[in-house]
Amino acid sequence: MLTIKDIHALEVMDSRGNPTIQASVVLSDNTKASAIVPSGASTGKREALELRDNDKTRFLGKGVLRACENVNSVIKHHLIGLEAINQAFVDERLRALDGTPNYANLGANAVLGVSMALARASAKALNLPLYRYLGGANALTLPVPMLNIINGGTHANNSIDFQEYMIMPLGFESFKEALRASAEVYHTLKKLLDGKNQLTSVGDEGGFAPNFSNNVEPLEVISQAIEKAGYKLGEEIALALDVASSELVDENFNYHLKGENKILDSHELVAYYKELVAKYPIVSIEDGLSEDDWEGWAFLSKELGRQIQLVGDDLFVTNASLLQKGIEKNIANAVLIKPNQIGTISETLETIRLAKHHAYQCVMSHRSGESEDSFIADFAVALNTGEIKTGSTARSERIAKYNRLLEIEHELKGGIYIGKELFKHG
């Protein structure tokens, strides 16, 4: 029986230059694997707790030495000797060990690092790719990437309110062709921005951060880039938004669009989305309303839920209980999947299974603070999520995931690229 022999955590850096955890697990056959935990910038208030040191003399208070120590002492002590390939049991032990609903004691960053590293070590020991270990024989589907090519909101220092403007290459037969087309659009967009004397500096997720004066200009220039690159707008490549509305709302559920000097209530904002969807081939809107505006979400879902994908990120925070509430209230029709929002691989799996059971789409997602770790690429294929958000075709921490998906596609001798089939069920 393969058991856990050793566990260790190290403070390393993420793509924003902030510290994060690298956890390593050694098994009884001396197989070793590591995992690096990501970190978000715009976070939902109900996310599991990311434990930081708050020691202002180190990393401006963002150190993770306490979380590392939790791995190297408490977690290590209680997990050594447990069966390695029983992921659910080990993850449940981690939850019990912490004793809080949101990992406030050990830190979700400490717990997730160990959970990820254990899965990777177990797969390695069994000589299986991670996607095959986690997903079994059914792990065959390559996800449609949602590439964030213009950044705004908290991901960029500009006047654009919406956090992410994305392209979705739906009209292609393979992942590699979809990615190639996306890269070509990205480079074409850069030339167009240069021609408009716009900055082509990039945000946290590799998208450009031009200083446009309103939230419509990015849709216009991206549409131009798609067509100039030689692709059919809406047919081969569609558009998607992550509004991150929780960053725009006040205590009265009024939404402040500073780039356009507008203050809108929930119904007015939904009307604005309807105008955009009518004018542009937008197939998905994420966090269209605040995580606390459930009444507004119900209206948004009623007005647009049969027409486009409505993704809950801050709304659900990868939490099965919150997703169940959304299902019961007919709110949204898709859930963003971020393992570090909930804490362990097993809890993430629970949320994905619940979503699939109720015909909610699943979007595997990175965080704005990432690393070279490509775990979510395997995870997306393992669970056939059908979609993945992992930034633009720039910045190596984003490219690491795309390159891993290209490897997986090659290993699967093509696999299945879901493409246009993604939204056909609805």
UniProtKB/Swiss-Prot annotation:
Q: Which GO terms describe its molecular function?
A: magnesium ion binding; phosphopyruvate hydratase activity
Q: Which residues cross the membrane?
A: none
Q: List the disulfide bonds.
A: none
Q: Which Gene3D superfamilies match?
A: Enolase-like C-terminal domain, Enolase-like, N-terminal domain
Q: Which domain of life is it from?
A: Bacteria
CDD domains associated with the record: enolase
Q: Which reaction does it catalyse?
A: (2R)-2-phosphoglycerate = phosphoenolpyruvate + H2O
A biological process term (GO) from this entry: glycolytic process
Q: Is Mitochondrion found in the keyword set? A: no
Q: How is the cofactor bound?
A: Binds a second Mg(2+) ion via substrate during catalysis.
The subcellular location is: Cytoplasm; Secreted; Cell surface
SUPFAM superfamilies in the cross-refs:
Enolase C-terminal domain-like, Enolase N-terminal domain-like
In which pathway is this protein known to take part? Carbohydrate degradation; glycolysis; pyruvate from D-glyceraldehyde 3-phosphate: step 4/5
Residues of the active site: 205, 338
Any one cellular-component term (Gene Ontology): extracellular region
Q: Where does Mg(2+) bind?
A: 242, 286, 313
| Keywords on record | Cytoplasm, Glycolysis, Lyase, Magnesium, Metal-binding, Secreted
The UniProt record gives the binding positions of (2R)-2-phosphoglycerate as 163, 338, 367-368, 389
Q: Which cofactor does it need?
A: Mg(2+)
Give the similarity note.
Belongs to the enolase family.
The task this protein performs is described as:
Catalyzes the reversible conversion of 2-phosphoglycerate (2-PG) into phosphoenolpyruvate (PEP). It is essential for the degradation of carbohydrates via glycolysis.
Q: What protein does this entry describe?
A: Enolase
Q: Which organism is it from?
A: Helicobacter pylori (strain ATCC 700392 / 26695) (Campylobacter pylori)
